[in-house]
């Protein structure tokens, strides 16, 4: 199988340096328009697609990001390995601003977003016990360390709806739950990537201590913006290190991410809604054709 790397860039990461034959491409999906056109090209010989999650100019809030269209569009382009890069707050003293956390678990507290490609007319249940790809996450950690940034492998990401930051009570609650970082965008993104059978890794770039820390007070947007710049530089270095680690060819995912739908479809073929099936052509075409 040919490798194609996808990158969804969050706050502060709006482009990828060094892409050859780079072109912004409009991708149409049955779920509406993605956040923006998608920058495609090659990096060190490996095909790559970059999508700014909030759109160029930061036009989408965490709630209005078209998550389904974004994942569908990347799947249509042939993305096999998808890396999410996003800003986050930290609940742990040791996970300091400027550090990267390679997320391996989520608690989803978002509530105003469509969270599945499936539904009435074609029901499917995929496993999210391990919502990120262990293989891809390990390679991201390796590439991040090569940039000199401090990397923490493993951590639980609390996804809040936003766009406001947490209250002090919320921040203390989430910390007491054992969460490591907090952000607004990785859900339902990770869920949809699993439904689309795309290997997904989440690189959470710490910008602040949320509002729980007694010596840092409430979230300071000015300080966040300053940290975003440094984090973005390291993120670009991480992405630059991925082609050499992933290569141009890939085997089946050892964790089964690319076969997540093998036993997931529940609706009998004769009862499936043709209109929904038509919308699932990219996401679930492998199993629907079978």
Curated annotation (Swiss-Prot):
Q: Record-annotated residues binding substrate?
A: 184, 208-210
Q: Which GO terms describe its biological process?
A: L-methionine salvage from methylthioadenosine; purine ribonucleoside salvage
Q: Which domain of life is it from?
A: Bacteria
The residues listed in the UniProt record as binding phosphate, with positions renumbered to this chain, are 11, 53-54, 86-87, 185
- EC number annotated for this UniProt entry: 2.4.2.28
Pathway field: Amino-acid biosynthesis; L-methionine biosynthesis via salvage pathway; S-methyl-5-thio-alpha-D-ribose 1-phosphate from S-methyl-5'-thioadenosine (phosphorylase route): step 1/1
The entry describes its oligomerization and partners as: Homohexamer. Dimer of a homotrimer.
Q: Which HAMAP family does this one have?
A: MTAP
Q: What is this protein called?
A: S-methyl-5'-thioadenosine phosphorylase
Organism source for this protein? Cereibacter sphaeroides (strain ATCC 17023 / DSM 158 / JCM 6121 / CCUG 31486 / LMG 2827 / NBRC 12203 / NCIMB 8253 / ATH 2.4.1.) (Rhodobacter sphaeroides)
Q: Which gene encodes it?
A: mtnP
């Amino acid at each position: 199988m040919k490798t194609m790397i996808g990158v969804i860039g969050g706050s502060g990461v709006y482009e990828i340096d060094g892409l050859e034959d780079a072109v912004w491409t409009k991708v149409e999906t049955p779920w509406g328009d993605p956040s923006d056109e998608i920058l495609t090209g090659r990096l060190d010989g490996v095909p790559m697609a970059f999508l700014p999650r909030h759109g160029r100019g930061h036009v989408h809030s965490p709630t209005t990001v078209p998550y389904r269209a974004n994942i569908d569009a990347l799947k249509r382009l042939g993305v096999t390995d998808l890396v999410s890069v996003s800003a986050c707050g930290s609940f742990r003293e040791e996970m300091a601003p400027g550090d990267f956390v390679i997320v391996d678990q989520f608690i989803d507290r978002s509530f105003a977003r469509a969270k599945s490609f499936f539904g009435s007319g074609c029901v499917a249940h995929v496993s999210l016990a391990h919502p990120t790809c262990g293989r891809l996450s390990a390679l991201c950690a390796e590439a991040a360390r090569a940039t000199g940034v401090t990397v923490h492998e493993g951590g639980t990401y609390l996804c809040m709806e936003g766009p406001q930051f947490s209250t002090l009570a919320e921040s203390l609650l989430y910390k007491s739950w054992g969460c490591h970082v907090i952000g607004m965008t990785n859900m339902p993104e990770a869920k949809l990537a699993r439904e689309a059978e795309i290997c997904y890794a989440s690189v959470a770039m710490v910008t602040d201590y949320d509002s729980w820390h007694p010596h840092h007070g409430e979230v300071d947007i000015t300080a966040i913006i300053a940290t975003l710049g440094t984090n973005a530089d390291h993120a670009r270095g991480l992405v630059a290190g991925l082609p050499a680690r992933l290569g141009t060819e890939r085997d089946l995912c050892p964790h089964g991410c690319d076969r997540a739908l093998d036993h997931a479809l529940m609706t009998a073929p004769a009862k499936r809604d043709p209109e929904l099936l038509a919308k699932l052509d990219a996401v679930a075409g492998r199993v629907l054709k079978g």
